[in-house]
């Protein structure tokens, strides 16, 4: 772990070894702004200076890419008939004819909170995969193919941990397998990792567990334990935890 102030050259200090290593490397950032800067400016400049024919790829989550099929569906969407939405949708359609990557960050003036974005991007749930009529032109699919063939892949922390979660489920892999991963803006890793890999348990869930414990115990194992007492202990502990957490919040 290396920490240093702004402007001392942290970025170049890890990019140069990454380029010279000969290894396939993932470079992960916390923000898409730095991700774009590394791919569009810093990496090409260093690769040219060092005279290295390095294949580089930029890969973001699917919500960053235009889905051509969903854009077609959006034309028929009722909400797209609203003047403001229709105007932005027309702008997206016009841009779609010239973009190679389909990265919505290329589209100047598109607010990341725009209601059009969910209409023209896909999710894991609504993506048709290889069954999609526009699959051969799919920007997400093409971006992942380029990443698999690249020596240096620039990603973000959200995508890295999404890949870890998907791999653990045994469903698929989002990123190429590598031996070297460099995390820039690493102070945000914990928060992002918890979002994808953490589990939450509320005091309300603990109280529900106590009630379920009592019901199951009385139904299936009556007389083998003091189920009422055990359930009461769980409920009391949950209430004590809630009170302690509330007091901690007040102290902070």
Describe the function of each predicted region.
Residues 2-5, 104-111, 221-229, 249-250:
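Short coil/turn segments at secondary-structure boundaries
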Residues 16-22:
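Alpha-helix C-terminal capping segments
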Residues 17, 66-67, 176:
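Proline-rich low-complexity regions
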Residues 20, 36, 41-44, 124-126, ...:
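Signature of the SF2 helicase/ATPase Hel1-core->accessory helical subdomain module
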Residues 23-153, 157-158, 218:
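A substrate-engagement module of RecA-like helicase motors
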């Amino acid at each position: 772990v290396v920490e240093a102030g702004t402007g001392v050259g942290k970025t170049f200090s890890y990019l140069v070894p990454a380029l010279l290593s000969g290894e396939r490397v993932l470079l992960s950032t916390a923000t898409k702004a730095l991700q774009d800067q590394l791919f569009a400016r810093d990496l090409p400049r260093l690769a040219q200076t060092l005279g290295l024919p390095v294949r580089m790829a930029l890969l973001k989550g699917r919500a960053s890419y235009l889905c051509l099929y969903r854009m077609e569906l959006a034309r028929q969407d009722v909400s797209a008939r609203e003047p403001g939405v229709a105007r932005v949708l027309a702008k997206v359609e016009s841009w779609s004819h010239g973009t190679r990557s389909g990265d919505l960050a290329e589209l100047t003036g598109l607010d990341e909170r725009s209601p059009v974005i969910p209409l023209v991007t896909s999710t894991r749930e609504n993506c048709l995969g290889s069954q999609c009529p526009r699959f051969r032109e799919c920007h997400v699919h093409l971006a992942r193919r380029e990443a698999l063939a690249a020596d240096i892949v620039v990603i973000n922390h959200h995508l890295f941990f999404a890949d870890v979660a998907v791999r653990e489920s045994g469903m698929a892999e989002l990123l190429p397998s590598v031996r070297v991963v460099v995390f820039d803006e690493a102070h945000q890793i914990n928060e992002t990792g918890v979002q994808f890999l953490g589990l939450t348990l509320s005091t309300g869930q603990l109280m529900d567990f106590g009630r379920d414990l009592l019901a199951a115990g009385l139904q299936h194992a009556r007389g083998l334990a003091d189920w009422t007492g055990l359930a009461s202990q769980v409920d009391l502990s949950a209430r004590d935890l809630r009170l302690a957490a509330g007091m901690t919040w007040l102290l902070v």
